[in-house]
Amino acid sequence: MKTTTIAKLLTIITIVAIGYFALPKLIGLEQSVKGFSNFNEVIGIPNNIARYVTGVVELITAILLILSLTRKSEVAHILGYLLLTGTMLGGLLTEYLIRPEPKMMLVYIAIALLIIAVYQLLNTYSLKTVDHE
């Protein structure tokens, strides 16, 4: 799998960002617990279950992206960015449909990571097509 320096840098930024958001959820930091405080009442999923599942999905995303860099695995790269796309779309839905008031900084971060994911997926496809020509 051919990658550019920009693609590698974006992957590193993504790994750091998604890891930064996964760890508080998994270790139960107070701010993270508060962030998931109304899941049960709004959509019927216990707050802690929603928090842990989100944290695990984010951690898996980070691991896949690390593997895509260290093992140069195209499959890990694509799966990681597809998972990131779904996670960020879920995050945006959460901000607007579940939270009483969206936290705009989280919205901006989710949009930025979503743009990176789409860019990386499109970049992977275009590099693959160039390799086959």
Give residue spans per PLM region.
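Membrane-interface extramembranous regions
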Residues: 1-133
